[in-house]
Amino acid sequence: MATPVALLSESVLGWSIFTVVLLVILAFCWVYIRKYQSRQESEVISTITAICALAIALITSALLPVDIFLVSFMKHPNGTYKEWAANNETRVQIEDTVLYGYYTLYSIILFCVFLWIPFVYFYYEEKDEDNNNKCLQVKNALKYTIGFVIVCSALLLIGTFVPLASPPNQNSTQWQKVQYLFEELGSSHGLAALSFSISSLTLIGMLAVITYTAYGMSVLPLNLIKGTRSVLYERLENTEDTEEVERQIDKLKAKCADGRPLSMRDRRNLQDLEDKLQLLHRRGRHLEIAERNCCNKVGSALRPMKILLGVFFILVALLFFVTLFISNLDKALHSAGISTGFIIFGTNLTNPLNELLLALQPVFPLDYVLITVITMYFVFTSMAGIRNMGIWFFWIRLYKIRPQRTRPQALLFLCMILLLIVLHTSYMIYSLAPQYVMYGSQKYLLQTPLPTAVPSQSNRSATITKICDADAPEDQCTVTRSYLFLHKFWFFSTIYYFGNWAFLGVFLIGLVVSCCKGKKSVIEGEVDADDSDFSDDEYVH
């Protein structure tokens, strides 16, 4: 009777923590979206879609620590299986539960990215065109969404028939081990199709991480440390600029006081000056509001705390940088090479974050908290990067992300980007802590011969405890389903590996750029020349 009770208690503990995190995630997503959505253009369907999409992404990341916890808690610290996990069928049943969770969440992600979010986006675009016919709006939105459905179907079809064949010039021993690990996951064509589609989305997420997260990791802490410019100084500077522009306008208008028309060049200069004057007046209104804003006054009082938080964030960013560099260097030196996706079993170089997670894992849920903090850190730094850069398509800026003034379409774009970014964080966390993500804190028993001077006693051996790695017997270590899901296709792992190097490079560039920039304005991003009057009035009133 003890075995089922122990099994139930271990499972309930892991899933109870997951449920608590789930509720926290839902609350966070609601507050996050409500903070940035436009107050006058808010749309119920786009708000709900954005909240659900972001929640699904974060929940998927929250499942990773549960996966690691379950494979780790099957064993005692001495390397033996616990009584309730001694049966291989029981272990498979537990891991299948996690696998079904990944199946469900990844399927929902595909549904959101390729069907639901595009449909809501195009539906709102049709609404913007003053189309009051609901049926026609739905019809046109579905027409545009079909293209995304075709892409999704193509990815699923390709994933179904892409074989996991051995690439040329591979290390046969390593590759045989890789094949065995994937056989553990099963050979279902449905799984292969889903894994291929998710890996394709993760590639897009990798590009978003390289673009937004790498820059955000440098700009967020440095902005906290540097702070903002003084509101009083900015108002004085804005007043002086306004007076100077008004003098230039009066000077140009004086040229036509006697009825003579202005030249083409003067008319163009006059128009530019009037536009600049309008922008300065708007800046003045925003600065006046900022001066009266209680939040800015509280922020000034909390300045020391912001500096400490900025120092903490930059230290965390540097820790990630060093850890990722060591992990990539380890793969370059000790993996089977590009032909196997730079897959490596265990760690050969000391990895600080991996060691920290392994140390915290036995005291559950400390490792769960740390993984959640890492995921949230990626989200916050990604959001900082997106807000500073905006949403771009090549060299064209599509949308700006600003508190209480973000359009519904921009919110949908924002959540899709964050969804893809969080999707890629599963591989990023593996890169930061490969041993932890693959095996958790599992250990196994190894028989080693004892040296002896007496030939008749040469068969004596001792049992030692080792951390699970590729050399462990097949029935002694269980690999997390997350690792297998993300590494089923070796060529994706190869691209992820080079993407990590690009991430490190962009982070260094962003760090240099952020250091060279001065303090940002207290109304940074609130007033731009290409803003509409409607957008400005929404903020002021």
Curated annotation (Swiss-Prot):
CC per GO annotation: clathrin-coated endocytic vesicle; endoplasmic reticulum membrane; lysosomal membrane; plasma membrane
Membrane topology: Multi-pass membrane protein
One Pfam family, short name: LMBR1
Residue numbers on the Extracellular membrane side: 1-11, 72-101, 167-189, 328-365, 431-488
Family matches, as InterPro entries: LMBD1_LysCbl_Transport (IPR050854), LMBR1-like_membr_prot (IPR006876)
Glycosylation sites: N78, N88, N171, N348, N459
Keywords assigned: Cell membrane, Cobalamin, Cobalt, Endoplasmic reticulum, Glycoprotein, Lysosome, Membrane, Transmembrane, Transmembrane helix, Transport
MF-aspect GO terms: cobalamin binding
Cell compartment(s), UniProt: Endoplasmic reticulum membrane; Lysosome membrane; Cell membrane
BP GO terms, sorted: insulin receptor internalization; protein localization to lysosome
Coarse class of the protein's main subcellular location: endoplasmic reticulum
Cytoplasmic face of the membrane: 32-50, 123-145, 211-306, 387-409, 510-541
Sequence intervals crossing the membrane: 12-31, 51-71, 102-122, 146-166, 190-210, 307-327, 366-386, 410-430, 489-509
Biological role stated in the UniProt entry: Lysosomal membrane chaperone required to export cobalamin (vitamin B12) from the lysosome to the cytosol, allowing its conversion to cofactors. Targets ABCD4 transporter from the endoplasmic reticulum to the lysosome. Then forms a complex with lysosomal ABCD4 and cytoplasmic MMACHC to transport cobalamin across the lysosomal membrane. May play a role in mediating and regulating the internalization of the insulin receptor.
Family membership noted in the UniProt record: Belongs to the LIMR family. LMBRD1 subfamily.
Record-linked PANTHER family: LYSOSOMAL COBALAMIN TRANSPORT ESCORT PROTEIN LMBD1 (PTHR16130:SF2), LYSOSOMAL COBALAMIN TRANSPORTER-RELATED (PTHR16130)
Name of the protein in question: Lysosomal cobalamin transport escort protein LMBD1
Organism: Danio rerio (Zebrafish)
Gene name linked to the record: lmbrd1
